[in-house]
Design a protein with these regions (language model features):
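C-terminal non-catalytic interaction/localization modules
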Residues: 1-51, 57-59, 68-74, 105-123, ...
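Conserved beta-strand segments of the P-loop GTPase G domain that flank and frequently precede/overlap
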Residues: 95-98, 127-131, 164-166
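Amphipathic alpha-helical interface segments within eukaryotic helical scaffold
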Residues: 67, 74, 85, 95-101, ...
Length: 293
């Protein structure tokens, strides 16, 4: 079986949207920790790579960047983890929303995502609705979307791409049945392929993610020269940890909310090659962050 090129998929959504469960549903196994009790859900990025129907999929579940109750230090570590794991950028964003009334809170969530990511990111996005059991029997998700102007506008900006799953009631649906996760996951995978191909295999990126990617590549070369027995996955993992540690030092005086803005493309990361540059770059970043926030 020929394996297609790897796709990096980032799951976005507020706390309680069901990101961990959707990730497990797509991969077909319980890889991601589902938090039913923590008010903030996932505290750190969770990442898993698996071959799904001939395609290598790397799912990166983000913590609730929007509306999280995590501490400043937890949030900062989580954002930096996402930066290093995503670099040089995700091929697809899955924006998760519940099948429920589209309130001002949801509108604000979408407004924040669009504001931080830019309109271009929506070319790499699809909306995935959770709690599909709330969808009336006679409706498909497109019917639900059309009932709300703001929601319909969002889906249209994502070029009409939307799907629905149910992490509780649709687990054992028959093949070909619209109201089954098996059917919906197959459709989601098709959409991921379409986005990947429409962008010629390119990913959403910005200067910050590109700089982080270059730093990871440098670390990989150094690790390979001293540890020839490690697998490529182990080398990448160690390189990410080293770069992540450097970023934690670099952003020691930067607030997590501001750092989130940098990750989402509001600002560019300046490459730090020395201890002197760490200090200088931190001062520059502080000025830039102050300008935007």
């Amino acid at each position: 079986l020929k394996v297609m090129a790897s796709r990096r998929i980032v799951l976005l959504g507020k706390t309680g949207a069901g990101k961990s469960s959707v990730a497990n549903t797509i991969l077909g196994e319980e890889y991601f920790t589902v938090s039913h009790f923590s008010p903030s859900g996932t505290k750190q990025c969770q990442e898993k790579t698996k071959c799904v129907d001939g395609r290598s999929i790397t799912l990166i579940e983000t913590p609730g960047f929007f509306g999280t109750e995590s501490s400043e230090d937890q949030m900062k570590a989580a954002v930096i983890s996402c930066i290093t794991q995503c670099a040089p950028g995700p091929h697809v964003f899955l924006i998760l929303l519940k099948v429920e009334r589209f309130t001002k809170q949801e509108e604000e969530l979408i407004r924040d995502i669009c504001q931080h990511f830019s309109e271009e990111a929506l070319q790499y996005s699809s909306v995935v609705f959770t709690h599909g059991d709330q969808l009336p029997e006679v409706e498909e998700i497109g019917d639900f979307v059309c009932k709300n102007v703001a929601l319909n506008n969002l889906v249209m900006k994502c070029r009409g791409r939307c799907h629905v799953v149910d992490n509780k009631y649709w687990k054992r649906g028959e093949e070909g049945n619209y109201r089954s996760n098996q059917f919906q996951v197959a459709e989601i995978l098709k959409t991921i392929d379409q986005i990947f191909e429409a962008n010629n295999g390119g990913c959403y990126t910005n200067e910050m993610l590109q700089n982080v990617h270059r730093e990871i590549q440098k670390e990989e070369i150094m690790i390979m020269s001293s540890s020839v027995s490690l697998s490529q996955e182990e080398i990448r993992g160690r390189a990410e940890v080293k770069v992540s540690d450097r970023l934690l030092i670099l952003f020691a005086g930067i607030g997590a909310g501001m750092l989130t803005g940098a990750f989402l493309g509001v600002l560019d990361l300046l490459t730090a090659d020395s201890e002197h540059n760490y200090v200088g770059n931190c001062q520059v970043l502080t000025k830039l962050f102050t300008r935007y926030y």
